């Protein structure tokens, strides 16, 4: 689905306000507690530029969710925007002597890089409260369930940054022509904890192990070894014949040698290139770190007793990727039930018998985008602990007595008690007594019979 928004639609948006900021809902795919919530912040937009910001914010969300692998999981995301006005449009460019009065005090030229667009604390302004502190306050007040924060800076200069080291995913982009690519690349940092795969030296940068960057050249222990064919040499020569394979290519994290990346090229190395298999896998696992594959399950109570032999309905509601379905398998007492692969399952209690039992549903994502999931992120298990105490009644030992009386014995199990009923036509049944079993039986003696040539008897347990 393509979501577009123009200035004429601003008044139709869902909004919520707090002091300086107003929250707008851009995209809803489910409750915030069960979706990944992308929040776009306005930086360098004046009061009369609200419409422009909402358009830019919507484009930022759309651009992110139309890029692989996000597109396949776009139904897992919600989109929001927070508008806060700046006194002036744009952003600081200290090297050229340009300074703007903006709400988050954003600046280019950070840490010696003209395109490194940041907010405080940074090398130009170390005061947390004048940048990231404002972000945190707005999010706490307006969208505490945020998962990915995107700050759109109203400046045409090429620039951006991404940081997840603080525990709060923050992505910053300008509105440059390349902004769509900047957002996707920086999401690799902010959302997937991915490393830059650049090989050019960056003085002072200290490389660390990341999902897509390593110093380990051992095939057996390499973190992305599941993607590497046995025929691929390690390290992998950086020539065109190896462009399509996952291997071990020298150069990553601003290091020419000693550090390796998974593929010859990738979104984390150059714009307008797709994420490689290893980076895409990491992003999918990051998605499942924040949302579970199951939206809901019924019954909501997972510990209960079943007294009746009537079938009991169970169900799960899996999330829905764009082009494939999640798989479902039902288990009883740890054993897979043949053919039980739908989201709904009808349990026949009599097939299990009395006692303690477990019913389990396992919902998993069979995507080919992930080959290694040791933490089981792509799988959700719901377990119901069941105590079956089923009624199993019989009328036995009929014995005729004097004065048209007789005795019956009720045997079996009836945790909820039982009723003895009588009928002359199998249609209308009259209750004669309600009681409970003692030691697995109950002896019933009728009163004197009158006006019946014959009568039928049965015993049932109340539902």
Predicted regions and their residues:
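Active-site-proximal segment of zinc-dependent metalloprotease catalytic domains
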Residues: 20-34, 41-46, 58, 62-203
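Short, composition-biased motifs enriched in small/polar/acidic residues
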Residues: 362, 382, 387-463
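Bacterial N-terminal signal peptides
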Residues: 2-14
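Solvent-exposed segments in extracellular or luminal domains encompassing
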Residues: 343-356, 445
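Sec/Tat signal peptide C-region and signal peptidase I cleavage site
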Residues: 15-19
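Exposed beta-strand and adjacent loop surfaces of beta-rich binding modules
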Residues: 35, 311, 325-327, 405, ...
């Amino acid at each position: 689905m393509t979501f577009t928004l123009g200035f004429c639609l601003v008044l139709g948006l869902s909004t919520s306000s707090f002091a300086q900021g107003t929250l707008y809902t851009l995209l809803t795919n489910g409750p915030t507690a069960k979706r990944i919530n992308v929040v776009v912040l306005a930086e360098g937009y004046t009061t009369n530029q609200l419409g422009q910001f909402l358009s830019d914010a919507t484009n930022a969300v759309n651009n992110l969710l139309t890029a692989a692998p996000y597109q396949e999981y776009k139904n897992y995301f919600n989109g929001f925007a927070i508008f806060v006005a700046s006194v002036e449009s744009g952003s600081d460019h200290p090297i050229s002597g340009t300074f703007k009065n903006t709400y988050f005090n954003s600046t280019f030229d950070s840490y010696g890089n003209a395109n490194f667009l940041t907010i405080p604390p940074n090398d130009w302004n170390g005061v947390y409260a004048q940048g990231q502190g404002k972000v945190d306050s707005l999010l706490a007040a307006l969208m505490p369930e945020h998962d990915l924060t995107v700050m759109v800076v109203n400046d045409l200069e090429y620039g951006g940054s991404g940081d997840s080291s603080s525990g709060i995913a923050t992505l910053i982009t300008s509105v440059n022509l390349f902004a769509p690519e900047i957002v996707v690349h920086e999401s690799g940092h902010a959302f997937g904890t991915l490393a830059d795969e650049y090989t050019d030296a960056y003085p002072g940068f200290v490389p660390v192990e990341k999902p897509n960057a390593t110093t380990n050249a051992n095939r057996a222990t390499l973190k992305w070894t599941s993607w590497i064919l046995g025929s691929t040499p390690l390290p992998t020569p950086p020539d065109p014949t190896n462009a399509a394979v996952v291997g071990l290519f020298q150069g990553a994290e601003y290091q020419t040698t000693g550090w390796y990346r998974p593929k010859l090229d990738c979104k984390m190395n150059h714009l307008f290139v797709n994420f490689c298999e290893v980076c895409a896998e990491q992003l999918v696992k990051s998605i499942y770190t924040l949302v579970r594959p199951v939206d809901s399950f019924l019954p909501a109570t997972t510990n209960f007793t079943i007294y009746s032999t009537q079938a009991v309905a169970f169900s799960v509601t899996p999330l829905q990727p764009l082009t494939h379905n999640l798989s479902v398998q039902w288990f009883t007492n740890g054993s897979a039930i043949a053919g039980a692969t739908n989201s709904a399952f009808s349990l026949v209690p009599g097939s299990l018998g009395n006692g303690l039992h477990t019913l389990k549903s396992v919902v998993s994502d069979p995507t080919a985008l992930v080959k290694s999931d040791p933490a089981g992120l792509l799988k959700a298990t719901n377990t119901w602990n069941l105590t079956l105490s089923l009624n199993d009644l019989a009328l036995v030992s009929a014995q005729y007595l004097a004065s048209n009386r007789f005795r019956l014995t009720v045997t079996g199990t009836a945790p909820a008690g039982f009723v003895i009923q009588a009928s002359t036509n199998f249609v209308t049944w009259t209750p004669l007594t309600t009681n409970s079993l003692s030691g697995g039986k109950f002896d019933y003696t009728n009163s004197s019979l009158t006006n019946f040539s014959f009568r039928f008897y049965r015993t049932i347990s109340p539902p």
